[in-house]
Amino acid sequence: MDIIYAVPTVLYRMLEMNLPHTHNLSSLKTIRYGGSPISPAKLEILLELFGQIFVQGYGSTECWPSVTILGRKDHGTQTHEQIARLQSVGRPMPGEEVIICAEDGLVLPAGQRGEIRIRGPNTIAGYYKAPELTKKNFSGSGFWKSGDMGYMDEKGYLYLVDRKQDMIITGGYNVYAIEVENCLNSHPAIQNSAVVGLPHDLWGEEVRAMVMLIQGSTTSPAELIDHCKQHLARYKAPKKIEIIDRLPLSPAGKVLRREV
C-alpha cells in the first residue's frame, strides 16, 4: 500500500496509536486527507512522524472530488510562512474558479472573510428536479454557494473559517467553532473536540465544548478553558467543557457537532 485516503479523525487515531513506530509503513508514499478541517498543531506532528507526504483536497458532492489542492511542497514546516500555510486548503486546481463573497454577492478582496463560492467543470449545474433549491444555492453567474466561510490570501491560497450555519454569536461577537476546536486540539491531552453554541439569556449564545482525550492522558475542564484563554480572545473561550468518552461521527468520520 503506497497511498491512503483519510479524514482528520482517522489521522488523529493514527497519532494516538503511534503507528509509525509500531508498524512498518515504509511503502506509504502519499497520505491524502480532507472531508473536514484538520488541526494545524496535529498536522505538524504528523509531518514530523511521516514526513512531507501529505496532500489535502477540498471539495464537495456538488463539485466532486476536489476544487483546491494543498500539495506535498505546501506541507513544509521550515519557515513561519510555511507553518501558517498548513491552515489553508490550498489553491484552486486548473479550471476551477473560487471567489469570496459578502451576503449581497459582492466579491471580496484577499484577506476578507465571506462565503466561498465555486464554479468549474466539475460543479453541478443544479439540483435534480429542485428548481427552488437550485435558485437558492446558485448565483446568477453560475457560482455554487458552498455555505463555507473563508478567505483567500494574496497568493491565492484558500482558508476555511467554518460552516456558515456553525458560527456562534455571543454578546454580539462572532465565534467560529473550528477556531476554538483547533485551539483545544492543540492541547497535548486532546484527541478531538466539538464546539457548539447553546442558548444563553444574557449573551444570546454561549460557547460550549466536548472533548475526547488521548488514551492515558489526563486534564481538567478548568485547565482546558485556561488553555483557550491563553491562545484566543477571552470571549471565544468555552464557558463550559465536558470530557466525554466518544464524539459522534458520521460514516465518513466527521464529527457531528449537532449530535453532541
What feature does the model see in each segment?
Residues 1-6, 15-84, 97:
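Gly/Ser/Thr-rich phosphate-binding loop
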Residues 4, 120, 125-126, 133-136, ...:
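AMP-binding/adenylate-forming catalytic core of the ANL superfamily
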Residues 10-11, 38, 123:
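Alpha-helix capping/helix-boundary segments
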Residues 25-28, 190, 238:
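Core-facing hydrophobic residues within beta-strands of well-ordered domains
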Residues 35, 59, 90, 148, ...:
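Active-site glycine-centered loops adjacent to acidic/histidine catalytic or metal-binding residues
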Residues 55-62, 90-92, 196-198, 242:
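Beta-strand->loop->alpha-helix junctions that form or flank phosphate-binding loops
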Residues 86-92, 107, 138-141:
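Short Gly/Pro-enriched turn/cap motifs at secondary-structure boundaries
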Residues 97-99, 110-124, 143, 149-150:
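AMP-binding/adenylate-forming core of the ANL superfamily
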